[in-house]
């Protein structure tokens, strides 16, 4: 899996397009960096840049952006609605793919140290990179903002993590760190700034102080007014959207606004958003309104509508959802991007990958897809109207499993490649040999994990498949018969792939546990597939 880190530096300039463009060029021209989004606001006088790349590349991209800003931004003249303490106010590094939080912490440390040494400016570490608990919170570090820095820097407790304890009027100070995806989500109100801020105080985790905490965990919020849009916003930062999601913030804001007789007129997402954040919101509205939507495209459209994400500007999923901008692998590497004819030809070529693992995953994925098809061929038809509620329940697991199993086609090939890469590591010194041995064992565990995940995924489908065999559209009987055997075959392939990769694993307890589990899953697949076929034959008779 290719490594990918997201960097989202916030610069204190949102009006001067020449400055905004110069910083954009500094990032875009950095080898290995892909600039995904530039979001500027005149009222906030702030621009948020989003770019991705390998860990070492995004550090260089952030430094190049800072160098450009150092020549062009003068904080002594800066005014804006958004809290800030420096020309490069905050620079977080965020794991996207194949990267741990610890690696992002190292990115923040490397960036902070080099920035301080080169430009001679104070740099603080926050979030997961913070060296003390008191510096984990960005608002706590920003307290008093730029204007308070001259006095704060004189105090020992506010000594920067890197750079001088000296005030640099043109720059201020920079905060660098590592964190999860932060969603900047603003809800639009036709109200005053004060009314929006009142709602923000009730919702944000900090609340109005220690004695009056807010309702929403992992949420920061303030109220402000956007002159260019002639409306107010409850401006929020969702620090962990898996704790408090977009829909929760929006619905709670609507409830507060209703109590104050204030109209909510949509919302705004600043920067990029993970697909999961939108799908979580879609799941909420589907459950709330008893909706049946399978396709991500439809679910995203629902969320855009319910949250009013296009109220201030068009919301274009292909340009705003990070997974759509940065696919797992390029078309030249991904088996999934290749035509079926090419995939089959590569399987038959003189190469170990793609091999049985990828074929097993593809076979199981098609089995799940066939089951989904049978459900959809039953759902929504007048003659099967009495089964609509049942199909709404049965179809989604097959649809989701088909997508997951499809992704394992590439995952299996990547796992094998990781093992081959470990085989090529040097073994000249004892340290080299130890590193190589550890990498080989990790590669084998990955090679075991993929087919095991395949078998576990198929196992979760058998109850639904049994029920579908009893009530699905009988005209699709052969499709369901093939589905059952395809799923069984997928597990059959997974079983032998697990065993062959377990052979060289040195952890005996792990080997015994996995061998027992995969054997159980294979036996279950044989039994369940036979039962599905028997039930279909009985219905025919």
From Swiss-Prot:
<dbReference type="GO" id="GO:0005542">
    <property type="term" value="F:folic acid binding"/>
</dbReference>
<dbReference type="Pfam" id="PF07837">
    <property type="entry name" value="FTCD_N"/>
</dbReference>
<dbReference type="InterPro" id="IPR037064">
    <property type="entry name" value="Formiminotransferase_N_sf"/>
</dbReference>
<dbReference type="GO" id="GO:0030409">
    <property type="term" value="F:glutamate formimidoyltransferase activity"/>
</dbReference>
<comment type="function">
    <text>Binds and promotes bundling of vimentin filaments originating from the Golgi.</text>
</comment>
<feature type="binding site">
    <location>
        <begin position="163"/>
        <end position="172"/>
    </location>
    <ligand>
        <name>folate</name>
    </ligand>
</feature>
<comment type="subunit">
    <text>Homooctamer, including four polyglutamate binding sites. The subunits are arranged as a tetramer of dimers, and form a planar ring-shaped structure.</text>
</comment>
<dbReference type="GO" id="GO:0005829">
    <property type="term" value="C:cytosol"/>
</dbReference>
<dbReference type="InterPro" id="IPR036178">
    <property type="entry name" value="Formintransfe-cycloase-like_sf"/>
</dbReference>
<keyword id="KW-0369">Histidine metabolism</keyword>
<comment type="similarity">
    <text>In the N-terminal section; belongs to the formiminotransferase family.</text>
</comment>
<feature type="active site" description="For formimidoyltransferase activity">
    <location>
        <position position="82"/>
    </location>
</feature>
<feature type="active site" description="For cyclodeaminase activity">
    <location>
        <position position="412"/>
    </location>
</feature>
<feature type="modified residue" description="Phosphoserine">
    <location>
        <position position="520"/>
    </location>
</feature>
<feature type="region of interest" description="Formiminotransferase N-subdomain">
    <location>
        <begin position="1"/>
        <end position="181"/>
    </location>
</feature>
<comment type="pathway">
    <text>Amino-acid degradation; L-histidine degradation into L-glutamate; L-glutamate from N-formimidoyl-L-glutamate (transferase route): step 1/1.</text>
</comment>
<comment type="similarity">
    <text>In the C-terminal section; belongs to the cyclodeaminase/cyclohydrolase family.</text>
</comment>
<dbReference type="GO" id="GO:0030412">
    <property type="term" value="F:formimidoyltetrahydrofolate cyclodeaminase activity"/>
</dbReference>
<comment type="function">
    <text>Folate-dependent enzyme, that displays both transferase and deaminase activity. Serves to channel one-carbon units from formiminoglutamate to the folate pool.</text>
</comment>
<keyword id="KW-0511">Multifunctional enzyme</keyword>
<dbReference type="InterPro" id="IPR004227">
    <property type="entry name" value="Formiminotransferase_cat"/>
</dbReference>
<keyword id="KW-0290">Folate-binding</keyword>
<dbReference type="Pfam" id="PF04961">
    <property type="entry name" value="FTCD_C"/>
</dbReference>
<dbReference type="InterPro" id="IPR007044">
    <property type="entry name" value="Cyclodeamin/CycHdrlase"/>
</dbReference>
<feature type="region of interest" description="Formiminotransferase C-subdomain">
    <location>
        <begin position="182"/>
        <end position="326"/>
    </location>
</feature>
<dbReference type="Pfam" id="PF02971">
    <property type="entry name" value="FTCD"/>
</dbReference>
<dbReference type="InterPro" id="IPR051623">
    <property type="entry name" value="FTCD"/>
</dbReference>
<keyword id="KW-0333">Golgi apparatus</keyword>
<keyword id="KW-0456">Lyase</keyword>
<dbReference type="GO" id="GO:0019557">
    <property type="term" value="P:L-histidine catabolic process to glutamate and formate"/>
</dbReference>
<feature type="region of interest" description="Linker">
    <location>
        <begin position="327"/>
        <end position="334"/>
    </location>
</feature>
<protein>
    <recommendedName>
        <fullName>Formimidoyltransferase-cyclodeaminase</fullName>
        <ecNumber>2.1.2.5</ecNumber>
        <ecNumber>4.3.1.4</ecNumber>
    </recommendedName>
</protein>
<dbReference type="InterPro" id="IPR022384">
    <property type="entry name" value="FormiminoTrfase_cat_dom_sf"/>
</dbReference>
<dbReference type="InterPro" id="IPR013802">
    <property type="entry name" value="Formiminotransferase_C"/>
</dbReference>
<dbReference type="GO" id="GO:0005794">
    <property type="term" value="C:Golgi apparatus"/>
</dbReference>
<dbReference type="GO" id="GO:0019556">
    <property type="term" value="P:L-histidine catabolic process to glutamate and formamide"/>
</dbReference>
<feature type="region of interest" description="Cyclodeaminase/cyclohydrolase">
    <location>
        <begin position="335"/>
        <end position="541"/>
    </location>
</feature>
<dbReference type="InterPro" id="IPR012886">
    <property type="entry name" value="Formiminotransferase_N"/>
</dbReference>
<dbReference type="GO" id="GO:0005814">
    <property type="term" value="C:centriole"/>
</dbReference>
<keyword id="KW-0963">Cytoplasm</keyword>
<dbReference type="GO" id="GO:0006548">
    <property type="term" value="P:L-histidine catabolic process"/>
</dbReference>
<keyword id="KW-0808">Transferase</keyword>
């Amino acid at each position: 899996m290719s490594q990918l880190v997201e960097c989202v530096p916030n610069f204190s300039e949102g009006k001067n397009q020449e400055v905004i463009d110069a910083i954009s060029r500094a990032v875009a021209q950095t080898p290995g960096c892909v600039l995904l989004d530039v979001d500027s606001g005149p009222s906030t006088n702030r621009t948020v840049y989003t770019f991705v790349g390998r860990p070492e590349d995004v550090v260089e991209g952030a430094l190049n952006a800072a160098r450009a800003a150092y020549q062009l931004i003068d904080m002594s003249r800066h005014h804006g609605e958004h809290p800030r303490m420096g020309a490069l106010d905050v620079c977080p590094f965020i794991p996207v793919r194949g990267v741990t939080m610890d690696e992002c912490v190292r990115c923040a440390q490397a960036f902070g140290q080099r920035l301080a040494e080169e430009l001679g400016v104070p740099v603080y570490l926050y979030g997961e990179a913070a060296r003390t608990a008191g510096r984990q919170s960005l608002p706590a570090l920003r307290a008093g903002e730029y204007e308070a820095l001259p006095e704060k820097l004189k105090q020992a407790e506010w000594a920067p993590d890197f750079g001088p304890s000296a005030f640099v009027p043109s720059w201020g100070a920079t905060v660098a760190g590592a964190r999860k995806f932060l969603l900047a989500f603003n809800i639009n109100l036709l109200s005053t700034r004060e009314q929006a801020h009142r709602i923000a105080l009730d919702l944000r985790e900090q609340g109005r102080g220690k004695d009056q905490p807010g309702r929403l965990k992992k949420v920061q919020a303030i109220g402000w007014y956007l002159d260019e849009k002639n409306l107010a916003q409850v401006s929020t930062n969702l620090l962990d959207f898996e704790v408090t999601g977009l829909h929760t913030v929006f619905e709670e804001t609507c409830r507060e606004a209703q109590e104050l007789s204030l109209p909510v007129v949509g919302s705004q997402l600043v920067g990029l958003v993970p697909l999961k954040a939108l799908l979580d919101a879609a799941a909420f509205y589907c459950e709330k309104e008893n909706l049946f939507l399978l396709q991500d495209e439809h679910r995203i459209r629902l969320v855009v509508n319910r949250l009013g994400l296009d109220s201030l500007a068009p919301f274009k999923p292909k340009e705003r959802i990070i997974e759509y901008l940065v696919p797992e692998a390029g078309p030249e590497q991904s088996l999934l991007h290749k035509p079926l004819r090419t995939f089959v030809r590569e399987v038959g070529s003189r190469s170990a990958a793609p091999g049985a693992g990828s074929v097993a995953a593809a076979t199981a994925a098609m089995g799940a897809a066939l089951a989904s098809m049978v459900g959809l061929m039953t759902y929504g038809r007048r003659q099967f109207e009495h089964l609509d509620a049942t199909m709404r329940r049965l179809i989604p697991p097959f649809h989701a499993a088909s997508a997951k199993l499809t992704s394992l086609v590439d995952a299996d090939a990547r796992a094998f490649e990781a093992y081959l890469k470990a085989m090529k590591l040097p073994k000249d010194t004892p340290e080299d040999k130890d590193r190589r041995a550890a990498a080989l064992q990790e590669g084998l565990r990955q090679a075991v994990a993929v087919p095991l995940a395949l078998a576990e995924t198929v196992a979760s489908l058998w109850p639904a498949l049994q029920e579908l065999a009893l009530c699905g559209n009988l005209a699709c009987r052969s499709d369901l018969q093939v589905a059952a055997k395809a799923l069984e075959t997928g597990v059959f392939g997974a079983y032998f792939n697990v065993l062959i990769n377990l052979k060289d694993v040195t952890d005996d307890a792990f080997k015994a546990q996995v061998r027992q589990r995969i054997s159980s899953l294979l036996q279950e697949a044989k039994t369940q597939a036979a039962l599905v076929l028997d039930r279909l034959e009985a219905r025919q008779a």
